[in-house]
Design a protein with these regions (language model features):
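Phosphate/pyrophosphate-binding catalytic cores of soluble transferases and nucleic-acid-acting enzymes
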Residues: 1-146
């Protein structure tokens, strides 16, 4: 049986964090942010990033984990957030995933794994796209898509 993870999703400033904190206090949980902007250090204004007062002593994960100049992908998020979830579960606590970035939430909950691509691989794909065009790459993608 899969471990329990509580997910709260919705638009920015809709009360997700306040609800997550209340539930964490009630159920013995910790909050894992699923917001594509709250991961960045210094991006507090306009992201509704919770203040220490709003956190009310509840541990929050995946806040301020990257510099705004860094590349940050859904794959990187899923690896880091999965480690947070595993750690929370290992301590007998409830992970409460709260945020509005559906791409992050969907991939985290689905447990998707992502391959690591080197710069060389990207260069090869870009060269092929220039030479053969994007339709050729699209056709290759269809070979690996089960519902195409």
């Amino acid at each position: 049986m899969a471990p329990n993870i509580l997910v709260i999703c919705g638009p920015t400033a809709s009360g997700k964090t306040a609800l997550a904190v209340e539930l964490a206090l009630l159920l013995g949980g910790e909050v894992v942010s699923a917001d594509s902007m709250q991961i960045y250090r210094g991006m507090d204004i306009g992201t509704a990033k919770p203040t220490p007062e709003e956190m009310r002593g509840v541990p929050h994960h995946m806040l301020d984990v990257a510099d705004p100049a860094e590349d940050y992908s859904v794959a990187r998020y899923v690896r880091a957030a999965s480690a947070c979830v595993d750690d929370i579960l290992s301590r007998g606590r409830l992970p409460i995933v709260a945020g509005g970035t559906g791409l992050y939430i969907d991939n985290l909950v689905a447990g998707r794994e992502f391959a690591s691509f080197t710069g060389r691989w990207r260069e090869r794909l870009q060269a092929r796209a220039r030479e053969e065009g994007l339709p050729a790459l699209y056709e290759d993608c269809l070979l690996y898509t089960s519902d195409a």
